[in-house]
């Protein structure tokens, strides 16, 4: 996976809070109640720059129609075989050594990865992610601590019933990646993209925060101002899950 450089993001993120606040402007979904409510929620925080909501889209407790899933963090040392499976799916199987050729080296690196400042984490929850009335086993994989690390990404994946494998069909709708490579795995292009889940009036949504897109050669960041998007997956009349972009926001800096 090509690394997504966020050093500048980290610097700007840590600017003092007294910098004039900006706001997220709704550019798609103005007629949707949830989109308007979500805009009010994110703008209720001190947005001294567009990166405040990068790591996690916070919820203001005053907006009682919103809430988050109950996430539980996994012990990645005890579940290191599971971690290998997840990272293989995400195209990261050789980023931290080769677990097949040299498992001892891979485990040594893993100990540093899960205890250091830039720790990799996996959180799990049961969420009705496709709004069909049945809860799925959903995990959120965090590539590194945010905003402390140079590289970051957060992906959402759905597991099968016994949590032994990734359910590819149910995971596909969650991979709303701006850059999907035809020659790569299904999940290629999620790096630098921060996914999250929220619930509004008992309906489950997922959103995507993106700093920018990579150029064709993968070396240059092309900034985009459509940073935050919200998606909804629901079954159609035939029972097929359909995913739609419901809201789109761009950040407007204070003048």
Pin down the residues of each PLM region.
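Short coil/turn segments that connect the beta-strands within blades of beta-propeller domains
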Residues: 134-135, 202
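Repeat-based blade/solenoid architectures
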Residues: 114-122, 175-192
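Sec-dependent N-terminal signal peptides
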Residues: 4-15
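Short glycine/acidic-enriched loop and turn motifs that connect beta-strands
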Residues: 144-147, 211-213
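Hydrophobic beta-strand segments that make up the repeating blades of beta-propeller
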Residues: 137-141, 206-208
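Acidic, divalent-cation-chelating loop motifs in proteins
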Residues: 124-132
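Acidic, small-residue rich beta-repeat scaffolds with periodic aromatic anchors
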Residues: 18-92, 181-255
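Beta-propeller blade repeat segments, especially FG-GAP/WD-type strand-to-loop junctions
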Residues: 148-173, 198
